[in-house]
Amino acid sequence: MQDGRTTLSKFLIDTLDRQPCSTETARNAGLSALLIDVAAAIKSISAMLTKGALGGNYGSAQSINTHGEEQKKLDVATNEIFVQQCEWDGLLAAMVSEEMESVYAIPPGYPRGDYLLAFDPLDGSSNIDINGVVGSIFSVLRNGEGNGNANEKNGSDPRGTVGESAFLRPGCEQVAAGYAVYGPSTMLVLSVGNGTHGFTLEREIGNFVLTHSNIRIPEDTVEFAINASNERFWEPPVRRYVQECKDGRSGCRASDFNMRWIASMVAEVHRILMRGGVFMYPRDSKTPAMEGRLRLLYEANPMSFLVEQAGGLSITGRERILDVVPRALHGRVPVILGSKHEVERIGRYHGEYDRGEDQPFTSPLFSRRSLFLPGFTA
């Protein structure tokens, strides 16, 4: 007897598997099965995290990942869960993870499929020791889609080994993206290109149930998230925007803003999807050689896909993130995403600054800021 609720499996069947074209139906059936695998990995991670310190997975793994960061035991364990859940059933050609330096090839004993999976198995792992909110992020591409000869142009050699270039495609080519947020409840937020939808894990029976259909981000907001400790390293357009927000009712925005920061991209983006806001991890001068802080393939791209599908915008400050062509597996970009009108404003400030047209503003830290200082001539 049906209870009228839509499970993740039913949603994927209704959305992907019932297409008039038999070829497309077959391809989408593979995508549905892959997303069910990802959901199974998320359930396992949720169960592991629920045990907390009792599970024996807290603390350092005594290893360093490809980014030079100390790995926690849970970073390693959650990465293994994703790999083991998704490698065996012939749906994937290869995987990329924040915790793995190079492309993970599907082992020879398993069949190879049509999709590529990029993921961050545990976003915000620095919050684990304080029992804070963490998450998982994932992105799905079709192997070789839009790249002509699969062996020559998608990073595959004649033996069928998938190389880095298979993944180095703009985020607009994603066929699915999502994240899990492990909070008081576990939620899976997903898009397959027909809007952004949220599913809540019903632990008693192990199903993800559709609870947030067709999420829409409000176009206007009075809330922003940024790590203010880096203010001295920000570019002037970001300092200008944040100062205007901090000035509140007495400033040019004539409105009071709230500032947030959780140190977990999943938690920040989830809040924006639920009630609006802007998330900023902008370019800065702290490490000049670094273009940004967040990884494009498995952080910025999937989150940007979800945000755009929900009516928001996502930019580097100067261009749409989903149009950026990756140059490396673990390449980074600045990220500014969220409510449409505020992201447009921040993008406009970057344009004005680059053209030398930015307006002066007063900052307690930086004093007056403008290219048009007294005595300045072009």
From Swiss-Prot:
Asked if Metal-binding is a keyword of the record, the answer is yes
PROSITE patterns this protein is in?
FBPASE
| Keywords associated with the record | Carbohydrate metabolism, Cytoplasm, Hydrolase, Magnesium, Metal-binding
Q: Which E.C. number(s) belong to this protein?
A: 3.1.3.11
Question: MF terms per GO, please?
Answer: fructose 1,6-bisphosphate 1-phosphatase activity; magnesium ion binding
Q: Which residues bind Mg(2+) 1?
A: 98, 120, 122
The cofactor required is: Mg(2+)
Q: How does it assemble?
A: Homotetramer.
The protein's matches in HAMAP family, at most eight in alphabetical order, are given as:
FBPase_class1
What is the name listed in the Swiss-Prot or TrEMBL entry for this protein? Answer: Fructose-1,6-bisphosphatase class 1 2
